[in-house]
């Protein structure tokens, strides 16, 4: 691995042609194994104007093609238990501290319902199906609770009855619980850091950023791929975004969901303006510069924030996306997503994890 240095310019050229050349040179170095520094990543945030941001996206797309190929990882999710969550995440409408106006409340869905939705997701083209539950996490469940056993049984059913790989997002968990999920058939688990370590206390106080990191480490120790990302548009600074991406690089996660905050009424962040689509594109592209081999996943908010520009994200470094509906909001149809991929010369399927891609 080529070691990082500060030899590259840290201020992008203002001239369009010079900027394009500078970005392509940096992209080529990253493709060859160079790890971009924080100073260089921050310099990319100084690029301004739609035309020049698109040049940044073009360079990020070159990195994606060289390091990941043209296959777009497709997954779908199901909210298996919703509402009355004990945590106070400012962005989430499922919190008991500030329930959103459009957040459903229900207990654990039946195994049959979950398996049927897994089959439907597979039929729609998804290759992975993630079981998502509210709450701080499995490690805090009562010893008398049967929920984990029910989830394990459902995961096993999905592996045998549906042509799709089961994933889970069940909050914090112990190493032993991670090992049990692995044995049941879970190969990837979603547990986002959400934000940088510095910004995190401004959006959540009922648990810590370090708590979340511990779970990611437990997943990796159990041999489960970490699907770990965050949210853009919560009022964080560019430096916060860079720090988040660098933390994900340090943790060597496999898949990185990039959520674009779609402010929900009733939540503490409900008053925030929606993120500018070109700022979102810039963030996506910079994440690709920092995380050249990781799966970068369009997650919540892509339709609401990107609108007609969402296809540009797939030319800015994205090589994965959720299809179908989200936890408490609706997404566009899988057929629309498949048509979008085809128009861009991309194919849905399973994208390679870091170190797997062979050109």
From Swiss-Prot:
SUPFAM superfamilies hit by this protein: Radical SAM enzymes
Quaternary organization: Homodimer.
Summary of the function given for this chain in its UniProt record: Catalyzes the conversion of dethiobiotin (DTB) to biotin by the insertion of a sulfur atom into dethiobiotin via a radical-based mechanism.
Superkingdom of the organism of origin: Bacteria
E.C. designation(s): 2.8.1.6
InterPro entries referenced in this protein's UniProt entry, alphabetically: Aldolase_TIM, BATS_dom, Biotin_synth/BioAB, Biotin_synthase, Elp3/MiaA/NifB-like_rSAM, rSAM
Gene name in the database record: bioB
Annotated ranges, domain Radical SAM core: 67-302
Keyword match Signal: no
UniProt GO MF annotations: 2 iron, 2 sulfur cluster binding; 4 iron, 4 sulfur cluster binding; biotin synthase activity; iron ion binding
Residues holding [2Fe-2S] cluster: 130, 167, 227, 297
Record-given protein name: Biotin synthase
Annotated binding of [4Fe-4S] cluster, by residue: 85, 89, 92
Catalytic reaction(s) noted: (4R,5S)-dethiobiotin + (sulfur carrier)-SH + 2 reduced [2Fe-2S]-[ferredoxin] + 2 S-adenosyl-L-methionine = (sulfur carrier)-H + biotin + 2 5'-deoxyadenosine + 2 L-methionine + 2 oxidized [2Fe-2S]-[ferredoxin]
Cofactor(s) the record lists: [4Fe-4S] cluster; [2Fe-2S] cluster
Enzyme superclass (EC): transferase
GO terms of biological process kind: biotin biosynthetic process
Family: Belongs to the radical SAM superfamily. Biotin synthase family.
Pathway: Cofactor biosynthesis; biotin biosynthesis; biotin from 7,8-diaminononanoate: step 2/2
Tagged with keyword Transferase: yes
């Amino acid at each position: 691995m080529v070691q990082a240095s500060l030899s590259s310019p840290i201020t992008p050229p203002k001239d369009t042609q010079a900027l394009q050349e500078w970005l392509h040179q940096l992209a080529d170095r990253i493709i060859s194994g160079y790890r971009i520094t924080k100073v260089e990543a921050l310099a990319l945030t100084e690029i301004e104007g739609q035309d020049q941001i698109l040049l940044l996206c073009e360079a990020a797309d070159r990195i994606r093609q060289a390091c990941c190929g043209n296959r777009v990882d497709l997954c779908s999710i199901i909210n298996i238990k919703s509402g009355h969550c004990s945590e106070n995440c400012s962005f989430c409408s499922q919190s008991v501290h500030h329930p959103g106006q459009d957040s459903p409340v229900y207990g654990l869905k039946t195994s049959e319902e979950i398996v049927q939705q897994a089959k439907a997701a597979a039929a729609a083209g998804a290759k992975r199906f993630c079981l998502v539950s509210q709450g701080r996490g499995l490690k805090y469940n009562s010893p008398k609770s049967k929920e984990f056993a029910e989830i394990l049984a459902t995961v096993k059913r999905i592996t045998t009855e549906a042509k799709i790989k089961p994933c889970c997002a069940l909050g914090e968990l112990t190493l032993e619980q991670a090992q049990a999920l692995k044995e049941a058939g879970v190969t990837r688990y979603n547990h986002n850091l959400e934000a940088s370590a510095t910004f995190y206390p401004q959006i959540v106080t009922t648990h810590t950023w370090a708590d979340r990191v511990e779970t990611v480490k437990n997943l990796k120790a159990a041999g489960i791929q970490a699907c770990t990302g965050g949210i853009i548009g919560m009022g964080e600074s560019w430096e916060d975004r860079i720090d988040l991406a660098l933390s994900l690089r340090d943790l060597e996660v496999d898949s990185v969901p990039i959520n674009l905050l779609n402010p929900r009424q009733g939540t503490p962040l409900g008053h925030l303006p929606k993120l500018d689509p070109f700022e979102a594109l810039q963030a996506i592209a910079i994440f690709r510069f920092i995380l050249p081999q990781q799966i970068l996943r369009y997650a919540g908010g892509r339709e609401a924030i990107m609108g007609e520009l969402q296809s540009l994200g797939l030319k800015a470094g994205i090589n994965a996306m959720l299809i179908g509906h989200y936890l408490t909001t609706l997404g566009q149809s899988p057929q629309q997503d498949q048509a979008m991929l085809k128009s861009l010369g991309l194919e849905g399927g399973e994208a390679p994890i870091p170190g797997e891609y062979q050109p």
